[in-house]
Amino acid sequence: MAKKGTRVVVTLECTEARTSSEPRRSNGISRYTTEKNKRNTTERLELKKFNPHLNKMTIHKEIK
């Protein structure tokens, strides 16, 4: 049997969507799902991803 992996599925959510007063293309919060290796990356992920609601690249942080 295969071992249980150290990879877990995490959700990334935009940090600028709630605080931004810029004009939006549509309402909503941008979220992405990805995998991370808990053994190598113990802290929370923080990546620059495209936010289709704000129509620009923003910082997305890992949420629980």
From Swiss-Prot:
Gene that this polypeptide is encoded by: rpmG
Protein family (similarity comment): Belongs to the bacterial ribosomal protein bL33 family.
Alphabetical UniProt keywords: Ribonucleoprotein, Ribosomal protein
Disulfide pattern: none
Keyword presence, Ribosomal protein: yes
PANTHER family: 50S RIBOSOMAL PROTEIN L33, CHLOROPLASTIC (PTHR43168), LARGE RIBOSOMAL SUBUNIT PROTEIN BL33C (PTHR43168:SF2)
Gene Ontology cellular-component terms listed: cytoplasm; ribonucleoprotein complex; ribosome
Lineage of source species: Bacteria, Bacillati, Cyanobacteriota, Cyanophyceae, Synechococcales
Name recorded for this polypeptide: Large ribosomal subunit protein bL33
Region of interest (Disordered), residue spans: 16-39
NCBIfam families membership: PRK00504.1 (NF001764), PRK00595.1 (NF001860), rpmG_bact (TIGR01023)
Single GO BP term: translation
Biased composition range(s): Basic and acidic residues: 16-25
Classification via InterPro entries: Ribosomal_bL33, Ribosomal_bL33_sf, Ribosomal_zn-bd
Organism: Prochlorococcus marinus (strain MIT 9515)
GO molecular function, one term: structural constituent of ribosome
Chain segments annotated as transmembrane: none
